């Protein structure tokens, strides 16, 4: 065995408390995976998500369970049959990509046969707070091209968006309910959000309880997040509504694995 896998926990304080509909946090707990092969070292990290039943301990155990196979040469393709989509597989998969890039001198995007790298516009997220606090945060980030606004369904969401729109009138806006609304809230807010220039609503209803959206009006484009956790989710999503866009996050193998 020439390869060796290690994993360690790191905690990074956030600049402030970050709130969504499910809770709040003031730090990010990550697991860092390193795969050593001779002088080469590939590394990656992941964030376990309680929403999917993950903890730091459970994800660490998943990673260490495949450590012997990785040491014996387990590759990215075979990894998909050894770990389910999730934080653990994401970290090991990305570490293997990084290791191969360093060993061959070929960037990961070349290995993946992506035609070319082009700049992409991403969103800047504002966590849930009072309308006044979110408006101040929006004003401080008014030059960013797209602001994503976390929502809760607590009755103050429309006030939050109105205050943000007034503070950052040039910014494009999307909102993310993180499963925090019900159908009545969606039907009430969607047309009003459209009037405020909101271009997309992400995951308004809970995953597994979003069928009512299939026949609901669409004044704003909808985006699936928690309802589209892996590739197996796509057929059901398409069957519900061909106009719903799946979201892609930075942890690709946790979202689009088999």
What is each residue range found by the language model?
Residues 149-258:
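Catalytic core of soluble alpha/beta enzymes
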Residues 1-173, 178-187, 191-195:
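N-terminal capping/lid subdomain adjacent to the active-site entrance of alpha/beta enzymes
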């Amino acid at each position: 065995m020439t390869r060796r896998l290690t994993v360690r926990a790191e905690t990074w304080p956030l600049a402030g408390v970050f709130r969504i509909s499910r809770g709040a946090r003031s730090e990010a707990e990550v697991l860092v995976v390193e795969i050593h092969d001779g002088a080469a070292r590939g590394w990656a990290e992941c964030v376990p998500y309680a929403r999917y039943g993950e903890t730091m301990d459970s994800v660490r155990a998943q990673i260490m369970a495949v450590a012997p196979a990785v040491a014996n040469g387990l590759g990215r393709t075979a990894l998909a049959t050894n770990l389910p989509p999730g934080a653990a597989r994401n970290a090991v998969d990305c570490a293997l990509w990084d290791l191969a890039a360093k060993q061959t001198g070929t960037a990961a995007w070349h290995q993946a046969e992506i035609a070319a790298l082009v700049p992409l516009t991403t969103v800047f997220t504002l966590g849930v707070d009072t309308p006044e606090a979110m408006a101040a945060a929006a004003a401080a980030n008014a030059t960013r091209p797209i602001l994503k606004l976390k929502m809760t369904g607590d009755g103050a969401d429309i006030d939050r968006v109105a205050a943000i729109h007034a503070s950052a009138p040039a910014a494009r806006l999307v909102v993310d309910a993180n499963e925090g609304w019900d159908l009545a809230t969606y039907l009430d807010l969607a047309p009003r959000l459209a009037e405020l220039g909101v271009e997309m609503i992400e995951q308004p209803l809970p995953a597994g309880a979003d069928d009512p959206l299939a026949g609901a009006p669409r004044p704003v484009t909808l985006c699936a997040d928690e309802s589209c956790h892996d590739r197996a989710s796509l057929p059901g999503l398409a069957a519900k509504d061909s106009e719903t866009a799946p979201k892609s996050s930075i942890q690709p193998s946790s979202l689009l694995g088999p």
